[in-house]
């Protein structure tokens, strides 16, 4: 049927052009009549009825076979504004949807109309803007100009066999990362930390230190009061001009918080496909997973791992794999840094463990280091970049290995040093670590706004290792 409809549209367009040019003689007159009749038809909406409301789930009937998982609905209550919802499940011939906003005023019997699937008309006019996951401005300015072709927010990753290789080393502007967790263009890195350790501060440092054509921020479940603080204090007008901020605050519905991550990834893909180098900063993947858990439990999906339904661990790689280099010949890449909020400082909890296995490296922020006054509180012994062997030069690799060895040895004896029970002379390697580790720690300490690059970082490390 679809092919026939396309053929009719093609034939009718051809006959209209010929008719208008005065060459319609000899053509079948019934084609003209058919084309005119098709143009006069009004599109018919697919609609159903709300039959039940329970918690986050909305039960609907009458949508028929044209509705599918992921389709959007416009729910029309007897009074009040329409409510957007998304179909999340089918059960016993009924559809179950999750609202994208408050459902106050919605009641059984409300009309549900099938709406277009989510797509974003991204354009260069989005640069410098703060938007919600639907592309609606949050900065008080008019809506940005629409792109020529809207992009679907739920899109597959580029085919694995056709993706470009990772690019050259990318300077992050943070000494601890440039030394011990170096990154290449198109790499995906996780920032793992408990609450209140300094993830947001580190993200602000990265936003100011990484050389990128476009920066895309995904603020998923962010505190409402922190949005302007982040934009005005951490980002600033200069970096905002080349950035797109997608935000769904903590009071937004679960589908909106989930959609913030997909929308930000879609925006990043738009600029990557133009051949630009994109830095994607997402805070946080954990809140994305929590939104997925709310949706799954609302439609009665069984909890499997610490209350997380299986679909959560299916969606995580679908999102994270979209970042990285584009297809061969694209020229652009998405270098992505994802924060992971570990619950109770447990770095082996399910979301952290799953994300760590997907990404190309992980950086651990330690509360004890932060309490000791060293910022950023990166635990270099527990941090890893899987691309480090291909990034570090021949003269840099032994420096990093030696620094790691000294820090590891010092970690074993520092309690003895603090208690005054350590005796110099019993272990030469421990003596060296006790002497040099504080100098290495000073190299790792860096104030917010303090500039750095890999050459400066390795120069400072050489000087620290050379101290007597």
Regions found by a protein language model. Give the residues of each.
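P-loop NTPase nucleotide-binding/switch module
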Residues: 112, 138-187, 201-205, 240-252, ...
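A broadly tuned "polar low-complexity/structure-edge" signature
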Residues: 2-3, 66, 74-76, 317-318, ...
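P-loop NTPase catalytic core
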Residues: 179-180, 186-468
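Acidic-enriched and Gly/Ser
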Residues: 26-32, 38-172
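Low-complexity, intrinsically disordered or signal/transmembrane-proximal segments
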Residues: 18-19, 23
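Extreme N-terminal basic, low-complexity initiation segments
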Residues: 2-13
